[in-house]
A protein has these predicted regions:
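Hydrophobic anchor at the beta1->P-loop junction of P-loop NTPases
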Residues: 6
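The feature captures the helix immediately C-terminal to the Walker
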Residues: 18-19
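ATP-dependent small-molecule kinase phosphotransfer cores
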Residues: 33-96, 103
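Conserved phosphate-donor/acceptor-positioning beta-strand/loop module used by diverse small-molecule
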Residues: 95-102, 112-135
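Small-molecule kinase domains that catalyze NTP-dependent phosphoryl transfer to phosphate-bearing small molecules
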Residues: 138-189, 195-197
Length: 197
């Protein structure tokens, strides 16, 4: 069993890369969240969308590998959104990909072991990330500023260097780049985990 862990700041290309990796038979480990779904997000594929009470119950029942709480303003009202992964048994005969922030990555590695994880940092300039956020629709400046601020706190160089095995510089939305990125990551995965192509 091996897992590619994609991490990176908001709108750095993690979801698009995950989708390309699924074409190489990677199985997405779906995180849970208590935030509302965005346009074009599908329950069970992008996230498991649950009510905040349900998420808090999973925490209290010790069902989570890792979770984070983010205080935000949603529709001009203070709210807390949770993100996290439940404890699940992974099939040792399958390839996996998961998207996590750095703290989640650290906890995931503690749970599954470093030898089973290949951590990829998706790097992208702030201006490009903001352009992508605006193009997603329903852009909210206050929420974007909160996310950028959280990213600056979360993605410190020392922690990145400690956890990251590989960095992808994702400068554009050129759809021709994504298959190339996925092909390289799949090749590295095959070599690292001694898998057949």
């Amino acid at each position: 069993m091996g897992v590619i862990v994609l991490t990176g700041k908001s709108c750095s290309g993690k979801d698009s890369t995950r989708e390309e990796l699924e074409k190489y038979n990677f199985n997405n480990i779906v995180s849970y969240t208590s935030r509302p779904a965005r346009i074009n997000e599908t329950n069970g594929i992008d996230y498991h969308f649950v009510e905040r009470d349900t998420f808090e119950q999973m925490i209290n029942n010790n069902e989570m590998i890792e979770y984070r709480a983010y205080n935000t303003l949603f529709l001009n009202k203070p709210d807390t959104w949770y993100y996290g992964l439940r404890k699940d048994t992974l099939d040792p005969n399958k390839k996996y990909v998961v998207i996590l922030d750095l703290e989640g990555t650290e906890n995931f590695i503690k749970y599954y072991g470093k030898k089973n994880c290949f951590v990829v940092y998706m790097c992208c300039p702030k201006s490009e990330r903001e352009r992508r956020a605006i193009e997603r629709g329903s852009f909210d400046r206050t929420e974007w500023n909160r996310r950028v601020s959280a990213d600056e706190k979360d993605f410190k160089a020392k922690k990145l260097n400690k956890l990251t095995d590989f960095t992808v510089i994702n400068m554009s939305d050129d759809i021709n780049d994504l298959p190339k990125i996925a092909k390289v990551l799949n090749r590295i995965y095959v070599e690292k985990f001694n898998e057949e192509v």
